[in-house]
Amino acid sequence: MATANGAHLFNHYSSNSRFIHFTSRNTSSKLFLTKTSHFRRPKRCFHVNNTLSEKIHHPITEQGGESDLSSFAPDAASITSSIKYHAEFTPVFSPERFELPKAFFATAQSVRDSLLINWNATYDIYEKLNMKQAYYLSMEFLQGRALLNAIGNLELTGAFAEALKNLGHNLENVASQEPDAALGNGGLGRLASCFLDSLATLNYPAWGYGLRYKYGLFKQRITKDGQEEVAEDWLEIGSPWEVVRNDVSYPIKFYGKVSTGSDGKRYWIGGEDIKAVAYDVPIPGYKTRTTISLRLWSTQVPSADFDLSAFNAGEHTKACEAQANAEKICYILYPGDESEEGKILRLKQQYTLCSASLQDIISRFERRSGDRIKWEEFPEKVAVQMNDTHPTLCIPELMRILIDLKGLNWNEAWNITQRTVAYTNHTVLPEALEKWSYELMQKLLPRHVEIIEAIDEELVHEIVLKYGSMDLNKLEEKLTTMRILENFDLPSSVAELFIKPEISVDDDTETVEVHDKVEASDKVVTNDEDDTGKKTSVKIEAAAEKDIDKKTPVSPEPAVIPPKKVRMANLCVVGGHAVNGVAEIHSEIVKEEVFNDFYELWPEKFQNKTNGVTPRRWIRFCNPPLSAIITKWTGTEDWVLKTEKLAELQKFADNEDLQNEWREAKRSNKIKVVSFLKEKTGYSVVPDAMFDIQVKRIHEYKRQLLNIFGIVYRYKKMKEMTAAERKTNFVPRVCIFGGKAFATYVQAKRIVKFITDVGATINHDPEIGDLLKVVFVPDYNVSVAELLIPASDLSEHISTAGMEASGTSNMKFAMNGCIQIGTLDGANVEIREEVGEENFFLFGAQAHEIAGLRKERADGKFVPDERFEEVKEFVRSGAFGSYNYDDLIGSLEGNEGFGRADYFLVGKDFPSYIECQEKVDEAYRDQKRWTTMSILNTAGSYKFSSDRTIHEYAKDIWNIEAVEIA
């Protein structure tokens, strides 16, 4: 391809070889490339021009001036040139070969060239307009592969496919070389990534902030012993997407102490200092120039902290200790926290995310403000969204920066913080509502503990003002449940309310104890605040004086002193202006159960924002056959941005032509999965069987155990029948599981082991053959989901009712025409409403029944179903190997005790579940009916686009406006 300076680079192809002619400025060299793609570099120097980069960096119009890059769209020829350029001059691999890994890196670098134009334009317009910007802080971002998503959003899929074909490669094969970014694990991180996609697509000014984990959570292997965890070094050869910003780094402090200076201010001094360095990843929107940033923090120490003397003295470990301590903060996601060291590391991770991100946000606010910084305008320019409780330390950290570093007083800083920060709750599980050891936090973050104590005291006084002191029992109950600090004495001002007085009388008179009543009109009077926000003196003025000689505090019976804790979820609710659940039923549980006391105090804070998923990744790009059908029958591609157009499929649901196309698309996706399962597990399955899939984090409340018990029951019944009876009573099924159990979650790992043992037995049973297969897919991730979900016939969302906040995989399955079996839990409730009750297989107890059922169990009144007992006995018989499953089955037995009594109601819901599965078989036999149900699931999934969710966040919580990059 000719260039401005006369150099050119082009390819000629023959059936046996590839010929590339490199023309240098002074001489010409020719070389041949065989089919194995071995490069031989010419000895003399040559010039390879990157045509795409030339257009980006030096855009020249015919008139000689700069061109408008907004209309620049690379063609296949310029992309081919760009890929060659990066293969040669952006070296990651040795120069001799142009095999798939190198082709991927060169292609990704070429895509990044295109992204950079829009990325820089987006950054520039945000700087110039200085509009309010949202910042999404999350410990997880489960991005998946970026290549196909990026070129799809840029509308360059065809051009890149042609360019790679010119270079002897297939786009799909090249894309498969990309490792999934190991920055997340489950729904929390995938939701964050879907949100970033929607934010960019909808042109909202926003950034994401996270940590750059070197090894992610772990890579899962399945062995004869079950799950094995190994490090997943997804950055082993680097990432072509990230851009290190060496000029963007911030100091992070741990430990040390707090002292009062001569000016009366509090200073956090000493301790351990590291720095957080920014790595930026571009997030392109679909059919828009807007390209926002995901900024990831990596931790290190300044080079000055390297102990050169110790190193030269042979004390190498000591010399590198500071660097090692800093780097390990970003080694893995969710390090084990059974040990004190693990807890410290997790808290360091959370604080690093919060501190670095807030320093960056504040620096940007100050830069955009110019010479006159008005801190009261900070919430008008900044919205911080905390994705679950992991970023809770944003609240005391923002307070610390504003008070200690920017010179604001307590009231000013608290007003700004509350107007800036908002919190998304993702769980009703008590163990997931984080609590940190007060002692540990005080050691690691002493200044923040002072601020949290002051916030807690503010809260205590607000509770007293709300509820008064007429009913001290009620007040005590509210204080116990609502305080941020758990197992703490009350502030002295409030403790006086609970003092039990004694009246001294004559010796021959009976001593009587009375309570000193404080009327509702009593006032809480405080003096001015110091820089910690603590009250320097607080007292209660009673409406009437009592003639009491002596007051004696009530002393409890001697008991074990419970550990002091910091309740992070309570701090989130107190410190933010909005609290949202992620599904309608979940938000009601949040208001009525989880945070009911706070809802009574601040009802205006609580909202619902039902989750969503991006239709770009989860239909448009992962399921091209279905996408083409949707476009054909709706008459437009607009459904990718306006998913309400999916509803137009409803009127064609019974159309025979559509149904035939629909089934063919599903089958083509299933054929891909057949090959994938054979490659990854060694098991052979047939595409004409029903694909019954449950893929999600392994947890007892998600009830993979209920699913596999149902499969065991099905298998046992099959074994009791003749071959003819089996075919009459059961449709062929391939039951697919996927998901990771946390390394320290023993019971979840037992479930993985059990599933794989059941599969090993059933899959090798010649009597059963293809009538039933059980496959556990190792190392489930986004890329595997993109393969499995389009091929699914039935998906299982069977959590104990009231325990799943929302779920998002259920939305992805529905979008891809998969019919669901599930409980009335999380987003299942809304999905069932949208797709139609008759197109959803419902079973099980409902959320409002759960507490009563657990009490019934505790009272010994529960009678298990005979079929459930039959399954347990069958497992214990050794039908699935010699492994001792007593601990697993024992969790389903008994009426009380930790880890027993079937807390997640597997036994209670089992009969309802297997009867519902019989209805599934019946429906699947009628393929016309099943296909109609499938089409109506896709048509009814329009509500569950993350675009809708983001519009609601932007309007109701963040108060930000979209700005389109021209």
Curated annotation (Swiss-Prot):
Which purpose does this protein serve, as stated in its record?
A: Phosphorylase is an important allosteric enzyme in carbohydrate metabolism. Enzymes from different sources differ in their regulatory mechanisms and in their natural substrates. However, all known phosphorylases share catalytic and structural properties.
Question: What does this protein need as cofactor?
Answer: pyridoxal 5'-phosphate
Q: Which UniProt keywords apply?
A: Allosteric enzyme, Amyloplast, Carbohydrate metabolism, Chloroplast, Glycosyltransferase, Plastid, Pyridoxal phosphate, Transferase, Transit peptide
Q: Which family does it belong to?
A: Belongs to the glycogen phosphorylase family.
- Alphabetically, which GO biological process terms does the record hold? glycogen catabolic process
First and last residues of the transit peptide: 1-50
Return the protein name.
Alpha-1,4 glucan phosphorylase L-1 isozyme, chloroplastic/amyloplastic
Localisation per UniProt entry: Plastid, Chloroplast; Plastid, Amyloplast
Enzyme Commission number: 2.4.1.1
UniProt organism field: Solanum tuberosum (Potato)
Which top-level enzyme class is recorded in the Swiss-Prot or TrEMBL entry? transferase
Query: What's the catalysed reaction?
Result: [(1->4)-alpha-D-glucosyl](n) + phosphate = [(1->4)-alpha-D-glucosyl](n-1) + alpha-D-glucose 1-phosphate
User: What GO CC annotations are associated with the protein?
Assistant: amyloplast; chloroplast; cytoplasm
- Tissue specificity annotation: Tuber.
Major subcellular site: plastid
